Amino acid sequence: MAKKAEIGGAGIWQVEEITQKKPLSAMTGDRDLIERLPKWLFPRFIDAESQVDIVSQSWILIVDGRVVVVDPCTGNGRDFPDFAPAHMLDTPYLERFAATGVRPEDVDFVFCTHLHMDHCGWNTMLRAGRYVPTFPNARYVMVQREFNRWDSRRPDHVPLAPNAGTFENSVLPVIEAGLADLVPDTFSITASLQIEPAPGHTIGHSMLHLAGESREAYFVGDAFHHPIEMIHPDLDSGTCESFALASQTRRRIIETCLTRNALVIPAHFPCAFGGALKLAEGELVFEPYDDPPATSLKA
C-alpha cells in the first residue's frame, strides 16, 4: 500500500515494506511503567495482547521541484541470520513504489537517516547476480560520520553482527557507481530540506527537516521506535549505540516539535505521516497526522 498526503506544500508518499509485531515487553519489563501508560496509546499503538506494530516504510517527497526518497527500507532476499525481522524478505515494495506514479529513475536524491539494514536496503537491488543502484539517476546523500561508522574497509571498523553485509550490499555499490555524496552533519539537500544531527541510535544518526510553506516536519529515523519513548525519553530498550546521546536527542526533538508545532515522523510508527506532539493537562500526547486524510493506493 502507498499513501499520500501534503505537508507544508510538499507532496509526500509513504511506501510500506512490511509491518511486524513485537511484544511490548521487548521494549520494557517495568510493570509499574506499563500499568501507568496513558489510554491514548491503546489500541492504536499497543493492542489487546500487549503487542506493538513495527513498520518498515519509506517516504517519497516532492519538494522544491525535486523527488527525494527517505529511508529506503530493507530490500528483498537479504541474508540477516542475526536479525530475523529483516531476514530474506520477499515484499512487493517496488510495486508499491511504482503505484505512486514515481519511477526509480525519476528520483533526484536518496537520504538514509542512518545505515542500518532497514534504512538503506533498497539503495540497491540484485541484478544479474550483483547489487546495483535502484535509483540510477539519484544522488545518494549520506552523512560522512555515519558512513565512516559502517565502512568495513576501515582498519578501525567495529562490526555489528545484525547489520553484517549491509555496507557491502547496500552502500558500497552506490559508491562504486559514483552516485554518493558524503556530507557534513548539517547539510541542505534542497532549499526546504536540511539534514540535522540526531545522534544516539547510531553515532552519525541524522534527521531530515522539512521547512514547509505552512508547516514543518522532521523525519527522525530511529530516534523513536514507539510513542512510549516520547512519554519516557529515558527508556532504554537496548537498541542505541549511545543511549546518553539518544536520550538527549529525543528530548531535543520533543521540545522542538512542541515549540514549532512541527510534525514528527519516526521511521517505524504505524502511522504513515507521523503526528503532532501536544500537551494535555501537562502530559505529552502524540496525535497521528490525519488532516487532510491520506489517500491510499494498493499495489
Language-model-detected regions and their locations in the chain:
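Cap/insert and terminal regions of metallo-dependent hydrolase folds
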Residues: 84-91, 95, 213-299
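Metallo-beta-lactamase
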Residues: 1-102, 106-118, 134-197, 214-221, 245-261
